[in-house]
Every structure is written in structure tokens, then in C-alpha cells.
Design a protein with these regions (language model features):
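N-terminal capping/small domains of soluble enzymes
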Residues: 1-103, 108-110
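Alpha/beta enzyme core
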Residues: 43-44, 110-141
Length: 141
């Protein structure tokens, strides 16, 4: 006798249909490829993956030490380290399997023009949605 199949966890958020209400937030799994390296997990386990914060130009991020372990978890101050939107769109996105889950870009900038230009680069990409990051506390600008 086989176990009954679980009920669907599908949800709709802002017109975007997700197979599950579980969304991996920006930075948790980099640009998505890290998640599939964890044994027993796949992109189909989540409704969406929000990519690591992406800026118009590459950023080195903050100098070390950027991660601090606490008794209740960890704190980080990565500083939006990323290869820049051109590399994300041209090299990283083509390596992701968009048939398995939804992908949401996290767009960061220092000026309105940065946000506009970074968002424009995602227009013709397979990204399902864009999240605007206006609150990263780990950068000086």
C-alpha cells in the first residue's frame, strides 16, 4: 500500500504561480547553483529562488571578516559581492534550469540609473520576476 500523495502547495503571488510557498531568499544559495549541490535537495523543492544581489558593475564586497557565527545562527556583511549584471545575464542565467522552479533577480544599486540599467539587462532574460533591493545594510553607499 503506498502513502497518499500530499496536497498541492501551489500558490500565486502577484500573478506569479509558484509550486510551493517556500522561497529561498536572496543570498541564501548564491545564484541558485549552490542549492543543487546539497545532497537530497533539488530546485523542485521550492517555489522560487531569489538570486544573490546583482549590481550594474561587479562588486568585490566588504573585506574579510564578513561572516560571524552566533549562538542563534550567523551574521553576515558580504557587501553585495557579485560579478555584475552582464556576467549574471550572459553566463550564470544560461546555466540555471528554469524548468525546475521560478527564479527572481535581486537588483541593487547606488543611484536610480543603476537600478534602471540593471533591471533593463534582465528584460530579455528568462527571469520570472525582479526584486528591488533598497535596504542592504552592509554597504557604505
Amino acid at each position: 500500500m503506498s502513502a497518499p500523495l500530499p496536497a498541492s502547495l501551489a500558490v500565486e503571488f502577484c500573478g506569479l504561480k509558484l509550486a510551493s510557498p517556500i522561497v529561498l531568499l536572496s543570498g541564501c544559495v548564491g545564484f541558485g547553483e549552490e542549492y543543487t549541490r546539497v545532497e537530497g535537495f533539488s530546485n523542485t523543492d521550492v517555489g522560487a529562488i531569489v538570486l544573490k544581489g546583482t549590481t550594474r558593475e561587479p562588486r568585490l564586497g566588504n573585506p574579510p571578516h564578513r561572516v560571524y557565527e552566533t549562538p542563534m545562527g550567523m551574521l553576515n556583511a558580504i557587501g553585495l559581492q557579485n560579478p555584475g549584471v552582464d556576467k549574471v545575464v550572459d553566463e550564470i542565467l544560461p546555466s540555471l534550469d528554469f524548468s525546475e522552479t521560478r527564479f527572481i533577480a535581486n537588483v541593487c544599486g547606488s543611484t536610480i540609473e543603476d537600478y534602471v540599467e540593471t533591471t533593463r539587462r534582465f528584460e530579455d532574460s528568462p527571469i520570472d520576476a525582479i526584486e528591488i533591493n533598497i535596504s542592504c545594510p552592509n554597504i557604505k553607499e
